[in-house]
């Protein structure tokens, strides 16, 4: 249960009921809309919740807000609710103070729901796909892939905890120009092995990394010089397949090491081989969205994007300045472009597989493609405007001792995901990369391996381990944590106890907001606050040496905190160490 929402709902109901009673007595006019806005004030010294209803409704009632507030408070019946008092503040705020029943219900909810505590049903019945990483399979994964990987994975978790049926997908770009370039790069290195580096020119736009040399060496070890006599087309096809067959399993292995497993690795080539790309181009043509020029098939991208920008509220004179141009779908040589494949892929997501919502995690450098793709899906009649969402993530810088790090100490090459995981614990990588997507981030390599409270991962996991140690000590002494119905939770009335319970109650709301904003870093920040609230409680509230009833209530609160920390760590894909 979302206890924050339950409290807000009660205040809304109390306000509506008081208003109706006042109307019946002729004290307030009828016909005023009663949808009270209820918030948690920044300063809770005067109350735990507040509503501005009296301020908002006073004009329609033709009364002073404080007069409205006075009338409503006289008609509010708090018996049986979560609240012990309601007070008028300032120009007409109504401030409500929580009673012990709410605090007890939070702890009871955690005990009852256990591993499911925090789960909601706001997206129940909705079929979501999160497509992320989708790194080029022609080489090692980089820091952008590392960030996109954890953002996509934790966003999928947040959506799952919000009730959605979630599908994680990796789109494998195994078709087109980059694969041809990949094959030519391996081919050139293969020829150089046989004829010498100076005898064979390497393609200027080829892939220059050592990984290509290693693939060429492996290909030569397996096939010798036999491919000198093959046709270029045979060499390119076989070398590309050879390279992909080695790179893709390595990518899967690195991602699984990173804690990421996909429901499907979807291959771009399957869309071309099945004719689905050609069929999608035909459908766009039938709908009037293409034309032929210079023996190529063009899509009316400028018109499509103009429609998209208008939907975003942009004015035509501003759109004109963007210099929008149409794009080629099928080249004069008969080959389809990457855009054609991408449109077909997203048509497949909606039309063939029936996803209600598709979320793509992209680097911010792809921002220009957003309106183009959403508009193309609109053009197909599949409502890309509302069903396709793109999360754009900013750049990552690796920093050590205040200096930007570009090369791996171990390999001397640009740092790959695999290199990073060799140096930094997976938990730290996942936590630090799960930063707010639209902010550029500096990944502090030194901080990530520190074992003190400056490292947020350590700080959170230490809170979890501390509770485990406490409960083990209690068990070793022959005591157990009582069930909530066997304990007097009203004894949890101290400042630090109630602050901790309020933080436990926030968990469901944090998940809801993370899903709403496509920002799983809400959970990072929440766990830091929860760990801090626990450490303050632990330092202020003794358990050993206290009377049994007080000790039992505090043990229950500690156990509830461990449960919520565990659930949050599960969402983030982090481990739960019982000792540190």
Short names for language-model regions:
Residues 2-104, 111, 115, 119-580:
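Non-catalytic interaction-recognition regions
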